[in-house]
Amino acid sequence: MKDCSNRGKLMIMIGLLVIAPVTILSFYPQDIGYAAFFLLPGLLSVLAGGLVCAFGKREAYFSSDRLTAQRHSNNTVLFTWFWGIAVGAMPFFLSGQLRFVQSLFESVSGWTTTGLSVMDVTQTSKIFLFYRSFMQYCGGLGFVLMMVMLVSGKRSMDLFNAEGHPDKLMPNLKQTAQTIFEMYIIFLILGTVAYVVCGMPLFDSLCHAMCSLSTGGFSTKLNSIGEYRSLPIEIVTIVLMLIGTTNFAVLLLLIRGKWRQAFHVSEVRFLFLLL
């Protein structure tokens, strides 16, 4: 994919993300009838991305004009988010779970980790509950960051900045993206285990860990974590949300044991002041 345009790469990645929930069907075979509603838009996005890579016009990232290059990066990120929202809405709409506008609303809320929902979770199948949580988890990372983790190009930094990431953990951008992703995965595993230890079922634990880390707010329960009436579960949720809202550079300092240096960061001080 080295010579592929960044828009094409991102379209392919979004398609794969939409297909990903199909992997849980081995655990919930009763939802197999919904598989086509994820595979169809996902594969079409992958195909469209492949066509853009093969025949599309390369972005003008090699202009000597820095402003022009940054403008193209901004346009690519803007296009990617609109594409992600449109493709992400399709499983809800094609399956008849939601009307078209409602599907777009749910997709926007999921990818942007806003947390507002129009779905009745008490009547929703497992695959859609997982999909909503997975959208928030991926949205918390950002499409561009995930792409940079897999492939890097000469203008990856422009795209990275255009999506609004302040974290520069490593000298190399790809290493930065991989470090953030690894931390995000580790926190997800730890959060899921913590929920299970506190008495939450495994499926709900995974979904709530994804939504808490992204500070998104989706839930598999009508009353969210209040459904469990458990102080330990609420404490785990608070900790995960604090982790999710903290700069990854600060988290890396804490992981490396540089506590004093971390608490000198103004962002951390202000956070504790608010708490």
Model region roles, listed by residue range:
Residues M1-L275:
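Membrane-proximal intracellular helices of multi-pass ion channels
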